[in-house]
Structures are given as structure tokens and as C-alpha cells.
């Protein structure tokens, strides 16, 4: 079979991701585009004659990049197309928005690269009474047009057949440009590198005349002739860029008049009716909060019901199983405990997180694919405008509920560097999936019937602190107003099950692999330090270990937030949590259960793997049957407790160490708000600078320590009023000083704001091949 590389390109919300998942299934690889942190997805699939590598290009409305501060997606797509890596392009077009989508199609066809138009979302178009003549559209464009409903898999085989039959596009003159434009484009094309095909050189010439900055990286000497060409054009027309765009839109209008009835189409009645409620100025925000709470409730509820299978099953396989092997093969006791506690305990920490995190990713994917997340950004626009940000900046923040890394990376979609930086600074306060795992464990241990409310309050606190951080930045070091907010609201539709499963699997796999490696390594590391004293001797009691000795020195720093000196394990959890938040659970699980593992007598003769696995399945089945009972629906945290008795195991020890629900909640406030994990810190440094990364870390630590201290000292004021009053006043005074210093630093920071990161275009301008990407 012949190998073929295909680029998949289309407008946002055109169904491109769904089509990608339909074609490639689970045969996908996710990475980054070279030199940038924008995600790159590749997949494999086969047709009758070809083995295809499909490259999913970023969603974009056009290939024209007007500003160096914006449109990174356009630059990536343009670079890939001009690189010649793709043998063929598949342009996904939304049939219900044909006129808007065809602008990108015309740009692709003008390049002369073989192209297939995948006319998607025909089911939505039909509901709006839109009729499109497929053959007529194909004839006008000069390339194959394949009708598709990717959510149902309709047209996939026809698309594969078209891929096998692909050939060069017919030489059809689509756009009629004014003759002066063509003359100047041809004159620029003549001085471009001769190894670029003639059609592409002419296209680059038009792009340069339109004001595209990225095409200059390919133009060679032609970029030196651009100013003269524009000067000659301005003697004959007011705005060359406007004339180029107008010629394309006239062509699109002529095509649509012939092949469709889009002018008489009816908007989706269902979408219109739902939007009257969801986008209502009074109901929109409460509905958004309810949807977020429902997503969290279902994730905890269903995930908690599935948890025994992963928890009890992993204990049987990786903890008791390792102990059985150790005793059977006569390993030294310390080695058996080390392996069971370190390796087995690490795996046992990761696997029970899978159900709840997986459910969270599933529901997030559902909300994104259904079209609701775009509405959430619209609803939040008024609040974001008060911060000096567009509503569009709330979209990356919502993504932060899954993981803060793509949330930080998503800030690239914002136009101004000020807006981008403010969003990056706010993103770490959004409660990610890893924090959910910590909250669920503490809620089950301390808050009982109020567990769901406690966790929801932490999610809301994260949003509130992100908003307050935005306000602080607006009135201190990042003054300014938001750019106008224009956003497309896609039609509501039921997401495709296969696409949802694939998206959830990709996110969950990334989480497990990333978290698993860190947790297991940290668990082994902690087990080693937990087994030896500072003098190198093996200890029988973890309170005499090297880890305990070092941690006790640091723990008094956290006394104001309710962490007492004998609870040194909680201090270790905070330090390891800086690597990855999910490691906090692993650390506490390893340390709080260490004494139990050391004291526990394991009898290999009584170990029965089959019985323990059957017990895990049976417990999961009972949990699933009880999941949707009224009592569990009212208190989903109870469903996540699994089989852990409060008197024994990690939860029981943790309950004794913290001593009160107030101390536990204060600890959770600190975990929510303090330094982001290493991955997020790296993303912040990459998207802004190391200086801004440092600012984010210091600001997060200040907010976390201040709020946790205020909460705990107010909650426990009656126990030690003098100490509490001193702590409260110290926190307030310190933050007044910090805000004052930030206001004084405003003028200097504003001047340096534009220099926070090297612009992509400047990087490209230094290379005629666009090597920066």
C-alpha cells in the first residue's frame, strides 16, 4: 500500500475533530508543533490503496495573519501547508455555514494543492432547510466535494474512496481580482525563490499585498519590493487588502447563489429556544453554576461507585501480591515492605483516581462538543469585561477544570498580550482534575453529609480567587480595557459517542501516564526516606525516619493554617504536590498507612488473589446498584469512600492528625491556591517568561497562605484568641504592603509588558523556511 500524508483543516466548530476521530479511532498520537506549545495530533488509517497519516491542523477561519500578536493557529496551518509535507488536504466545511467556511476553501484552492472538500454537518443544514447541490459545488470549486455527517459516520467510505482517487484540482479561475492586484502579485512572484511552485508564489504575493506578515518569511527578496508595490497600488485603489477580501467574498456569494439556498434558510428553532434561557442575563450565570455542580456531582457519584474495582483490585494485585511474592521468595522484610509500600502503594494511589478523573473528562468533553461551553464564555463576558478581559478569555479558564496546562496554553487564542498574561496568571486557580482527587478523599474523611457542598465551595473559591487576581492585576500592573468580544455560537447537537470516548481516553491516558510516573517515583523515594534514619540505620517506626526528622523542622511554618507539628506528613504532601497535585494523595496515602503496613502481620498462606478480586468486583457492583439511590444522590461523596473505615487505614490516621474539619478545610484551601504543578509552571514560562512564572508562584503562595490562615484562625478563634488576632492582622498588613508595591511598580511593568515573550513572527522573519515552527 502507498503511504499518504493528509492535512485536515477547517474552521472551528466545523466537526473537524469528530471526523478525525471517526477516521483514526484510537490510532492517534498527541504531541506539540515544533517550537510552540500548541497541540499537534496525528492519526493513522487505511483506505483500499493507501496507508494514511492524518495530521489535524489547528482550527482557523483563514490563512491570513495580520498581527504578530495574534493568529498563531493561522501561522501553524499556513506553514504546514506551504512546507509540502502534505500530499493532500481535506477541508472540512460546515454545510450550515457554507458562506463563511468557503473563505478558507478559496485560499486553499488558490494554492494549487490537491484538495477534497468534506461537506460536514449536513444533518444540521437539513434541519435548517438548507439545500446544497453537491455536484454543482464540486464543479464550481474544481475539486471533489463529499457530503458527510461525521457524528453518525455517514459518508466516511465515500471520503476514503475519494482519497484513493485523488488528483490535482481542476484549473478553474475562482476569484476575479482587479488587474492591478494581479500585476503586482505577479511582479512579487517573479523575485521569490524559484523552487516554490508558480501558483504558490502568486498566492504568497496576494497574501503579502493583503497584509499577511507570515508570508514574508517565504518571500525571500520579494519582501524588499513590497512597499513599492503597495505604493503603486494605492495610486489606483484605497485599500488593497479590502479589495482582495472583497473579491473573494464576491466569488463566495456567486457560488452560494448557484449551489444553495442559504439566504432563505431558517435558524435552528431548538438552539434559539434554549439560548433564550441559557443566555438570559439573569438566568445565565445560575444555570452555568448548576451545570458545573451537576458535572462535579455525577463525576464523584459514578466515579466513586466504580472506585472499589480499581482500589481493592490494585491492593490485591500490587500490594498484597507483592507482599506474597516477597514472603514466598524470602525477601528481607524491609525490601518487601519497601516494594509493597513504594511500588505497590504508588500504583494503588494512581488507579483509584481513574474513575472520577475519567468521568470529569467525559462530562467536560460532552459540554464542549454539545456547544454549551461557548455559551458559558458568552455568559461570563460581562464579568470578564469588569476585569478588563474579553469573555473569550473564560474559555481557557473553563478548560482548567480538566487540567491547568491546556488552560495556560489556550491563552494564545487571545488577541492582546495584556489579556493573554492576565488569563495565564488566573488559570492556576481553577481547580483541576488532580485537585478533585484530593478534595474527594478529604471530603469523605471529614465532611460526611456536607461533603458535596465542601468540594463545590472549593471549586467556587478557585473561580473567585481567579477573578480577584484579575481585578488586582487590572488596578495595579496591567491596566487597560478589553478588546471587543466576537464569538461564534455553534448549534446545539448531541455529541458522537465514539468521539467522546476517544477524547476522554486521550485525556485520561495522558493524566495516568503523567501522574503515574511521578507518583510511583515519589512513593518509592518517600518509602526509602521513611525506612532509614538520618544516620542511615533502618527504623522500625516512621516517626524516627529521616523524612520525619526533616519535615518536623519545616512544619511549624504551617502552624497558622492548622498543620500541627505531629502532622509532618501533611507538610511533605505540600512539597511533593508542587511536582503534581495528584501526588498529594499518594504522599499522604504512603505516609499515613506506613505504620499500618509495618505493624501488619501478612500471612502468605491466607492470601487468595481470586477472592480479593471477586470482592472488588462485588463491592463495585453493590456500589453501582446504590449509585442512583436518593441518599447517594443527595450526598455523592459517600459513594466515593469505597470500603475505607474511618477508624483504620489512611483516612483514620488523617482524621486523627488534622484533628478538626476546620484544619482539613484550611489545608484544602492551601492545596487549591498554592504553587501550580511543575507542568503548569513550565507552560507559564513558555507562554510568557520565567519572570512571570516566578510572579505566579509567589502570588499563589501568598494567596494560599493568607486565605488558609484567615479561615483557620477565624474558625478556631475561641481556642487561642490572642494568637489568632496576631495572625489575622499580620496577614492583612502584609497584603496591604504587597498591593501597594504592585501599584508603585505599575509604570515599569507596563513598559515591559510587550516584551514578555518573543513573538512568533519575529522568530519566523529570521528564517526563510519558517524553521521556528
UniProtKB/Swiss-Prot annotation:
How does the UniProt record describe the way this protein sits in the membrane? Multi-pass membrane protein
Q: Domain FeoB-type G, which positions?
A: 3-169
What residues does GTP 3 bind to?
A: 56-59
The entry's GTP 1-binding residues are 10-17
User: How is this protein induced?
Assistant: Iron uptake is repressed by the global regulator Fur.
Q: What InterPro entries does the annotation carry?
A: Fe2_transport_prot-B (IPR003373), Fe2_transport_prot_B_C (IPR011640), FeoB_Cyto (IPR041069), FeoB_GTPase (IPR050860), G_FEOB_dom (IPR030389), Gate_dom (IPR011642), P-loop_NTPase (IPR027417)
Q: Name one GO cellular component term.
A: plasma membrane
Which domain of life, per UniProt?
A: Bacteria
Q: List where the protein spans the membrane.
A: 282-302, 309-329, 344-366, 383-403, 427-447, 453-473, 518-538, 664-684, 691-711, 722-742
Gene3D superfamilies, alphabetically?
A: 1.10.287.1770, P-loop containing nucleotide triphosphate hydrolases
> Where's it mainly located?
membrane
Residues reported to bind GTP 2: 35-39
Q: Where in the cell is it found?
A: Cell inner membrane
- Which keywords does UniProt give here? Cell inner membrane, Cell membrane, GTP-binding, Ion transport, Iron, Iron transport, Membrane, Nucleotide-binding, Transmembrane, Transmembrane helix, Transport
UniProt family annotation: Belongs to the TRAFAC class TrmE-Era-EngA-EngB-Septin-like GTPase superfamily. FeoB GTPase (TC 9.A.8) family.
The cross-references to NCBIfam families, in alphabetical order and at most eight, read:
feoB, PRK09554.1
Question: What job does this protein perform?
Answer: Probable transporter of a GTP-driven Fe(2+) uptake system.
Name of the protein in its database record: Fe(2+) transporter FeoB
Q: What species does this protein belong to?
A: Escherichia coli O6:H1 (strain CFT073 / ATCC 700928 / UPEC)
Amino acid at each position: 500500500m502507498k503511504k499518504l500524508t493528509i492535512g485536515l483543516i477547517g474552521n472551528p466548530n466545523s466537526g473537524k475533530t469528530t471526523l478525525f476521530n471517526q477516521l483514526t479511532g484510537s490510532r492517534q498520537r498527541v504531541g506539540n508543533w515544533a517550537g510552540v506549545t500548541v497541540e499537534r495530533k496525528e492519526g493513522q488509517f487505511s483506505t483500499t490503496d493507501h496507508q494514511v497519516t492524518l495530521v489535524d491542523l489547528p482550527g482557523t477561519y483563514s490563512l491570513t495573519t495580520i498581527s504578530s500578536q495574534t493568529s498563531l493557529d493561522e501561522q501553524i496551518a499556513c506553514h504546514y501547508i506551504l512546507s509540502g509535507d502534505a500530499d493532500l488536504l481535506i477541508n472540512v466545511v460546515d454545510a450550515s455555514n457554507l458562506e463563511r467556511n468557503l473563505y478558507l476553501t478559496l485560499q486553499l484552492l488558490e494554492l494549487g494543492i490537491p484538495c477534497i472538500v468534506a461537506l460536514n454537518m449536513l444533518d444540521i443544514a437539513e434541519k435548517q432547510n438548507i439545500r446544497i447541490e453537491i455536484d454543482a459545488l464540486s464543479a464550481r470549486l474544481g475539486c471533489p466535494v463529499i457530503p458527510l455527517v461525521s457524528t453518525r459516520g455517514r459518508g466516511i467510505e465515500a471520503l476514503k474512496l475519494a482519497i484513493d482517487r485523488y488528483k490535482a484540482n481542476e484549473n478553474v479561475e475562482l476569484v476575479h481580482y482587479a488587474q492591478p492586484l494581479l500585476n503586482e502579485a505577479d511582479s512579487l512572484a517573479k523575485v521569490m525563490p524559484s523552487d516554490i511552485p508558480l501558483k504558490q508564489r502568486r498566492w504568497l504575493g496576494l497574501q503579502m499585498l493583503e497584509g499577511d506578515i507570515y508570508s514574508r518569511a517565504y518571500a525571500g527578496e520579494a519582501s524588499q519590493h513590497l512597499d513599492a508595490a503597495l505604493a503603486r497600488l494605492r495610486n489606483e485603489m484605497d485599500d488593497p487588502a479590502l479589495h482582495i477580501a472583497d473579491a473573494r467574498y464576491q466569488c463566495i456569494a456567486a457560488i452560494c447563489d448557484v449551489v444553495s439556498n442559504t439566504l432563505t434558510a431558517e435558524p435552528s428553532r431548538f438552539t434559539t429556544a434554549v439560548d433564550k434561557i441559557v443566555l438570559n442575563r439573569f438566568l445565565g450565570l445560575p444555570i452555568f453554576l448548576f451545570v458545573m455542580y451537576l458535572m462535579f456531582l455525577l463525576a464523584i457519584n459514578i466515579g466513586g461507585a466504580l472506585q472499589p474495582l480499581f482500589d481493592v483490585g490494585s491492593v490485591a494485585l500490587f500490594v498484597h501480591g507483592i507482599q506474597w511474592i516477597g514472603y514466598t521468595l524470602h525477601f528481607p522484610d524491609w525490601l518487601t515492605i519497601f516494594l509493597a509500600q513504594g511500588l505497590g502503594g504508588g500504583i494503588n494511589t494512581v488507579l483509584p483516581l481513574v474513575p472520577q478523573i475519567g468521568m470529569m473528562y467525559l462530562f467536560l468533553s460532552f459540554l464542549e462538543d454539545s456547544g454549551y461551553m461557548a455559551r458559558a464564555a458568552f455568559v461570563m463576558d460581562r464579568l470578564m469585561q469588569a476585569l478588563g478581559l474579553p469573555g473569550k478569555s473564560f474559555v481557557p479558564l473553563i478548560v482548567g477544570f480538566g487540567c491547568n496546562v491546556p488552560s495556560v496554553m489556550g491563552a494564545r487564542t487571545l488577541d492582546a498580550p495584556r489579556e493573554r498574561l492576565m488569563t495565564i496568571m488566573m488559570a492556576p486557580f481553577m481547580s483541576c482534575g488532580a485537585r478533585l482527587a484530593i478534595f474527594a478523599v478529604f471530603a469523605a474523611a471529614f465532611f460526611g453529609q456536607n461533603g458535596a457542598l465542601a468540594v463545590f465551595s472549593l471549586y467556587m473559591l478557585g473561580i473567585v480567587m481567579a477573578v480577584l487576581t484579575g481585578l488586582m492585576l487590572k488596578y495595579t500592573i496591567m491596566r487597560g480595557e478589553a478588546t471587543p468580544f466576537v464569538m461564534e455560537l455553534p448549534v446545539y447537537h448531541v455529541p458522537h459517542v465514539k468521539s467522546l470516548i476517544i477524547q476522554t481516553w486521550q485525556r485520561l491516558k495522558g493524566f495516568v501516564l503523567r501522574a503515574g510516573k511521578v507518583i510511583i517515583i515519589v512513593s518509592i523515594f518517600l518509602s526509602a526516606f521513611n525506612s532509614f534514619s538520618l544516620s542511615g540505620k533502618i527504623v522500625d517506626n516512621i516517626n524516627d525516619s529521616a523524612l520525619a526528622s526533616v519535615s518536623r523542622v519545616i512544619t511549624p511554618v504551617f502552624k497558622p493554617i492548622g498543620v500541627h507539628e505531629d502532622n509532618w506528613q501533611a507538610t511533605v504532601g505540600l512539597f511533593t504536590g508542587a511536582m503534581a497535585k495528584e501526588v498529594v494523595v499518594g504522599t499522604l496515602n504512603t505516609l499515613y498507612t506506613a505504620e499500618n503496613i509495618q505493624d501488619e502481620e501478612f500471612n502468605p498462606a491466607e492470601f487468595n488473589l481470586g477472592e480479593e478480586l471477586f470482592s472488588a468486583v462485588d463491592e463495585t457492583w453493590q456500589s453501582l446498584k446504590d449509585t442512583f439511590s436518593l441518599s447517594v444522590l443527595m450526598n455523592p461523596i459517600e459513594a466515593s469512600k469505597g470500603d475505607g473505615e474511618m477508624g483504620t487505614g489512611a483516612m483514620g490516621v488523617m482524621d486523627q492528625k488534622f484533628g478538626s474539619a476546620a484544619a482539613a478545610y484550611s489545608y484544602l484551601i492551601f492545596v487549591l491556591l498554592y504553587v501550580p504543578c511543575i507542568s503548569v509552571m513550565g507552560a507559564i514560562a513558555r507562554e510568557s517568561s520565567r519572570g512571570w512564572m516566578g510572579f505566579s508562584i509567589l502570588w499563589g503562595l501568598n494567596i494560599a497562605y493568607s486565605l488558609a490562615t484567615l479561615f483557620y484562625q477565624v474558625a478556631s478563634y475561641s481556642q487561642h484568641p490572642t494568637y489568632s488576632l496576631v495572625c489575622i492582622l499580620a496577614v492583612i498588613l502584609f497584603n496591604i504592603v504587597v498591593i501597594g508595591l504592585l501599584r508603585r511598580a505599575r509604570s515599569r511593568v507596563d513598559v515591559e509588558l510587550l516584551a514578555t515573550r518573543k513573538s512568533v513572527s519575529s522568530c519566523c522573519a529570521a528564517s526563510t523556511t519558517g524553521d521556528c515552527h
